[in-house]
């Protein structure tokens, strides 16, 4: 009878020790820069900018774009694609892109939509397209590749910034 409380007490002590283990860096010791656990992104951002407001579906994004009079930026990507991952890292870490992105309705998709206007030159990733508040796909705002018009690479951040500004500027002159 006495063994059960003693066993429970020992189990609690072991569990408390495990949970309360000192994880702070001691003075003079090097901090391990590699975290053993991967950082989980916010559900809708999928790591593209956790502080930004993202929409869940294409239909919701179109509605918000029209009602808020903001352009829509759609990012097509895949979690397992190394090109998508590289672009995501640059997009999320670039302060200027993140600041400018606040002026858009944002949607990132890991699946294709039924709207064929969003894949005029094929279904490839990563692909970034813009839609204006009148729900017109901005086919004129393209990346630097002739065979993948809406593709961007990590080195294309200046072009992406220019295209984001173009989407905002043309929005103001058209309305």
Swiss-Prot record:
Function: Required for MUC2 post-transcriptional synthesis and secretion. May play a role in the production of mucus by intestinal cells. Proto-oncogene that may play a role in cell migration, cell differentiation and cell growth. Promotes cell adhesion.
Presence of keyword Disulfide bond: yes
Key words of the record: Disease variant, Disulfide bond, Endoplasmic reticulum, Proto-oncogene, Secreted, Signal
Related illness: Respiratory infections, recurrent, and failure to thrive with or without diarrhea: An autosomal recessive disorder characterized by neonatal onset of recurrent pulmonary infections, coughing, wheezy episodes, interstitial lung disease, and bronchiectasis. Episodes of vomiting and chronic diarrhea result in failure to thrive. Results of sweat chloride and pancreatic elastase tests are normal.
Motif, Homodimer stabilization: chain positions: 45-54, 60-67
Pfam families listed in its UniProt record: Thioredoxin_7 (PF13899)
Variant or mutagenesis effect after changing residue 71 to T: In RIFTD; uncertain significance
Protein name: Anterior gradient protein 2 homolog
């Amino acid at each position: 009878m006495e063994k059960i409380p003693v066993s429970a007490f020992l189990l609690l002590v072991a569990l408390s020790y495990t949970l309360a283990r000192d994880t702070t860096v001691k003075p003079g010791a090097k901090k391990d820069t590699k975290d053993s656990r991967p950082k989980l992104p916010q559900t809708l951002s999928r790591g593209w900018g956790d502080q930004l407001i993202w929409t869940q579906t294409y239909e919701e994004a179109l509605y918000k774009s029209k009602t808020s009079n903001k352009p829509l930026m759609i990012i097509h990507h895949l979690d397992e694609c190394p090109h998508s991952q590289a672009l995501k890292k640059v997009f999320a870490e670039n302060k200027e892109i993140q600041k400018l992105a606040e002026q858009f309705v944002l949607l990132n998709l890991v699946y294709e939509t039924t709207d064929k206007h969003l894949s005029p030159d094929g279904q490839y990733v990563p692909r970034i397209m813009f839609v204006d508040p009148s729900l017109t796909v901005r086919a004129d705002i393209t990346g630097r590749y002739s065979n993948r018009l809406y593709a961007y690479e990590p080195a294309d951040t200046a072009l992406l910034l220019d295209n984001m500004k173009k989407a905002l500027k043309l929005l103001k002159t058209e309305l």
